[in-house]
């Protein structure tokens, strides 16, 4: 039984009011780049996910945040692995860093779930796909959208993940990292996708 989008939004909003789910703060972090005119969407994605300073910004943000932090990416080899390696090599010993993607079997995903439900300061680097369908984590405090995503449903599913209220949580924060690489009056592809996502956030 599929809820329509309008019903789904009503459910989220009503549940927040009743206190069944955590309240959600959304921070859009718009990174300003030198103007660039990309021929294709793929060219822009490659530029973004291979951008060293951008990836280090995500690493520093994740390491600075307190609480269980989920970092969502779109491409395993292209973005997920480099991010995981960057974060894991800089993390303090007592802070666990996990890497979850479509290739990780169900048992591993369950292990990650049980760890986060027992921990309060872990970092999980995960593919959108794994989390939008597979894992429910009650004890999430922060979510970072590290890769551009234009899928409305996927964004809503990701938001739903964070909103399940843990025993010690009433507030969660979403960090949506976006990129302004506009060339003259021409907005870059992923900036247009951000504008779409902001509409969703405002509707929520």
Listing of model-derived features with the role each one plays in the protein:
Residues 102-200:
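Conserved RecA-like P-loop NTPase helicase motor core
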């Amino acid at each position: 039984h599929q809820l329509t989008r309008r019903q789904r939004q009503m459910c989220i909003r009503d549940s927040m009011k009743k206190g069944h789910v955590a309240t959600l703060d959304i921070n859009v972090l718009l990174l300003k780049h030198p103007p660039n005119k990309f021929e294709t969407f793929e060219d822009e994605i490659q530029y973004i996910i291979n951008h060293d300073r951008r990836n280090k910004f995500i690493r520093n943000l994740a390491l600075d945040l307190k609480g269980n932090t989920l970092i969502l990416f779109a491409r395993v080899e292209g973005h997920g692995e480099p991010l995981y390696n960057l974060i894991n090599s800089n993390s303090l010993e007592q802070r666990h860093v996990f890497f979850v993607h479509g290739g990780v079997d169900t048992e591993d995903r369950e292990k990650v779930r049980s760890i986060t439900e027992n921990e309060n300061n872990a970092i999980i680097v995960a593919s959108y796909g794994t989390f939008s369908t597979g894992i429910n984590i009650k004890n999430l405090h922060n979510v970072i959208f590290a890769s551009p995503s234009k899928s409305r449903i996927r964004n809503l599913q990701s938001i739903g993940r964070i909103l399940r209220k843990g025993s010690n949580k009433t507030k969660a924060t979403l960090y949506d990292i976006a990129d302004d690489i506009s060339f003259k009056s021409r907005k870059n592809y992923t900036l247009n996708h951000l504008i779409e996502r902001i509409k969703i956030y405002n509707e929520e």
